[in-house]
């Protein structure tokens, strides 16, 4: 283990213990409080009383507060804004934790710049067997071209290098990594995957979707202890953004074991709602174990994650017609219909919610068709099945979400990140059904919002800002990108609270600060309902509380 990693371990361990407090009763007074109620109305309060891990009472301005002598802990909010804790309905906790411990390529503007970061990281961590990283995005580079192994070979030739694209649907390898994996020009593309090649048919070093396994299967798997540390690193970081709960998409058996071992030392710092990975080799065994819920409701397992296609940026999203910028190419369906139905049917028959990744219009149609067939077959209409991303839809499929009782689990910052290339990929007509939040809501669908971290920043205020403005943090473009799809402030807030909770079967516990619900709340540095919408992304969580316990802040 590297010196840098040991330092990170010590720092994270210290962070996890600092600023945590609990009390049997807590009165937080002098706050500018906001929560939604059961009628989805935004209500105000000036003080909140917590008993154990639950909200006991909200107090409006002028209400008599309880005798402070009867309260174990009294805190004065100094008039700052206190709101319901925010929920990210789609992220990847282990990947996020690992990304904090690997070379970070987010923000690079050239292939050479990315390679330089790899060189510096490898030099600082000389004892590593593999150099791993993530975050590159060729769409944002000057060349707008996929990278090649050559640039990595020039900076690290003596160790294998593997770098995941920002969306996790492509990877970039150096020549040694390909040699270890036995990749040659004769290596065939696997089903649902693509090896990018040069004009002579030689692999360039980029592997898309199912082809990534050709390299990744040669990387030594993380041990349970390494996974536990990465999970704790991630959860502690997520708490600093004001996230009190996340839905962890595509979790394998070893990571489930790591979560459960962490519970032996007490509740997790934030809530995690696990989606089991359908491709896990022990998938049927995990389903046979049934649902899981710890005593403190910090770990819940009642859903599965399936991937139907790839991502738009790497042209892996499955489209009905050709990509507008690549004639003859329609993306990748990752599983046969028979295999996908096997995954879905097994989960539905076991009483699990099915959450299927679908980005392209062909993938979304396939998933909705499959849900329509299998929901009727299994009688699982009450399981609130979801489509993760639901990014590009035919108009006729938009109405099917509400009709089938299917939840679109969407990530607002995907729209503001993809706006630079989405029209190039799919053209002016299909874009009308892309990132179509307003059309879906008007058709009766409920949207669970999230970020897809580490693909995007986990900062939920970035997501709230994007939902309301359809702009990036530079407030570009003026007026918003396809602004007719914007959410209202209350709708956006609900998508990160009530509706995200509903999408995980936790609306009776989470999503608002109504009496009887869990005491998950955050104290903010500004009033997100009073400042200009263009400034919402700047908001910061000063404190984060889960189960009435402070997990972030002083």
Predicted features and spans:
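Gram-negative bacterial Sec-dependent N-terminal signal peptides
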Residues: 2-20
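Divalent metal-binding segments
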Residues: 25-29, 34-36, 40-287, 302, ...
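His/Asp/Glu-enriched, well-ordered alpha-helical/loop segment
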Residues: 39, 229, 344-354, 359-385, ...
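Short loop segments at secondary-structure junctions
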Residues: 54, 175-176, 526-528, 549
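P-loop/Walker A phosphate-binding loop and immediately adjacent motor/lid segment at beta-alpha junctions
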Residues: 121, 534-554
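Flexible, active-site-proximal loop/turn residues at the rims of small-molecule/cofactor binding pockets
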Residues: 137, 252, 414, 528, ...
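Acidic (Asp/Glu)-rich catalytic clusters
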Residues: 263-265, 290-299, 380, 401-403
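Short proline/glycine-enriched turn/loop segments at secondary-structure junctions
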Residues: 292-293, 532-536
């Amino acid at each position: 283990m590297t010196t840098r990693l040991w330092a990170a371990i010590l720092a994270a361990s210290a962070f996890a213990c600092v600023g945590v407090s609990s009390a049997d009763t807590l009165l937080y007074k002098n706050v500018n409080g906001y929560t939604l109620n059961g009628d989805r109305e935004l209500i105000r309060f000036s003080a909140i009383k917590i008993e154990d891990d639950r909200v006991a009472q909200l107090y409006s301005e002028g209400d008599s507060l309880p005798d402070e002598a009867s309260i174990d802990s009294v805190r004065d909010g100094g008039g700052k804004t206190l709101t319901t804790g925010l929920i990210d309905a789609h992220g990847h906790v282990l990947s996020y934790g690992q990304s904090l411990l690997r070379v970070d390529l987010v923000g690079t503007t050239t292939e050479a710049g990315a390679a330089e970061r790899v060189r510096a990281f490898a030099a600082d961590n000389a004892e590593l067997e593999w150099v791993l990283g993530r975050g590159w995005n060729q769409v944002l580079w000057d060349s707008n071209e996929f990278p090649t192994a050559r640039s990595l070979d020039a900076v690290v030739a003596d160790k294998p290098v593997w770098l995941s694209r920002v969306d996790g649907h492509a990877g970039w390898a150096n020549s040694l990594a390909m040699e270890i994996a036995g990749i040659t020009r004769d290596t065939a593309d696997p089903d649902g995957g693509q090896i990018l090649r040069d004009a002579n048919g030689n692999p360039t070093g980029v592997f898309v979707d199912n082809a990534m396994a050709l390299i990744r299967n040669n990387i030594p798997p993380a041990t349970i202890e390494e996974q536990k540390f990465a999970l704790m690193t991630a959860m502690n970081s997520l708490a600093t953004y004001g996230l009190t709960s996340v839905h962890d998409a595509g979790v394998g058996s070893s990571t489930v074991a790591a979560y459960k071992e962490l519970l032996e030392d007490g509740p997790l710092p934030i809530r995690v709602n696990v989606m089991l990975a359908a491709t896990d080799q022990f998938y049927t065994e995990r389903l046979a174990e049934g649902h899981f819920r710890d005593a403190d409701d910090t770990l819940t397992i009642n859903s599965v994650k399936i991937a139907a296609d790839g991502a738009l940026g790497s042209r892996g999203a499955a489209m009905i017609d050709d990509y507008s910028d690549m004639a003859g190419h329609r993306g990748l369906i990752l599983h046969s219909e028979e295999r996908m139905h096997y995954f879905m049917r097994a989960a539905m028959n076991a009483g699990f919610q099915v959450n299927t990744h679908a980005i392209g219009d062909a993938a979304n149609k396939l998933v909705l068709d499959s849900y329509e067939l299998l929901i009727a077959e299994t009688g699982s209409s009450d399981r609130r099945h979801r489509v993760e991303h639901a990014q590009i839809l035919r108009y006729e499929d938009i109405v099917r979400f509400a009709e089938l009782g299917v939840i679109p689990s969407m990530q607002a910052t995907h729209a503001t990140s993809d706006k630079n290339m989405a029209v190039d990929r799919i053209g002016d007509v299909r874009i009308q059904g892309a990132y179509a939040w307003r059309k879906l809501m008007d058709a009766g669908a409920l949207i669970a919002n999230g970020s897809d971290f580490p693909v995007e920043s986990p900062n939920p205020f970035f997501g709230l800002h994007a939902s309301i403005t359809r702009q990036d943090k530079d407030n570009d473009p003026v007026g918003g990108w396809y602004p007719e799809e914007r959410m209202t402030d209350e709708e956006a807030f609900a998508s990160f609270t009530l509706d995200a909770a509903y999408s995980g079967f936790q609306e009776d516990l989470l999503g608002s600060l109504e009496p009887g619900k869990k005491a998950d709340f955050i104290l903010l540095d500004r009033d997100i309902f009073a400042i200009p919408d263009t400034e919402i992304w700047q908001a910061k969580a000063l404190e984060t509380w889960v189960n009435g316990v402070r997990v972030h802040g002083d």
